[in-house]
Amino acid sequence: MTEILKDSGLLHNFMIFEYEDVQPSKSSDGIVTMKGIIQKAQQPNANNRIYPRPILEREDAKYQELIKERRALGELDHPDSPIVQLENVSHVVTETLWEGDDLIGTIEVLDTPKGQILEKLIGRDIKLGISSRGLGSTSRTNEGYDKVEDDFNLVCYDMVSNPSTSGAYMNLQESREYKTLVNQNRMVLLDEILNDILEL
């Protein structure tokens, strides 16, 4: 298959985070955790990009060290930077595992300013997405997809509003399911959330 070098730099992969079980953990003083698909291999996402399984497996293996040291931090929204800014951190990834070509992740919401916003959004039944952030290049395949190349380096997983990978919405680990996607009055809702936090 002939491929043409297309682009290099910061790569984002957005997915709806279909979290199963989003709930305050009984054993951790009400800390909110979420579990769901955070990455998919071997299939095009909404950005027309394909991540080969061997590359994702390699990067996930490297990411385990950050998970072990509780340094697998992520931000709320998606900055155009290869560096995680501590002032914007909202969560930490605590575990990942493969189920077929789906990478499943468990995320713990942190008690930070951005983490409080994230928790408020979750509490308002807003369906969020998850997005990987990494550095690397892509090449165009004959089928018209952008294939991620071997130089890809994973930076982190961010929580976002518009993911590109299908099935990457996260759910609260709770008895109820989060099915409502709020599309209207988002700015008004964010103002209310910020006011709630400022009043704490």
Describe every region a protein language model picked out:
Residues 4-7, 13, 73, 92-186:
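Residue microenvironments linked to proteolytic maturation
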Residues 46-48, 85, 115-119:
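A short, polar/proline- and glycine-enriched secondary-structure boundary/capping micro-motif
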Residues 190, 194:
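Charged phosphate-binding loop/patch that engages nucleotide di/tri-phosphates or the phosphate backbone
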Residues 35-45, 89, 106-113:
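Secondary-structure transition/turn motif
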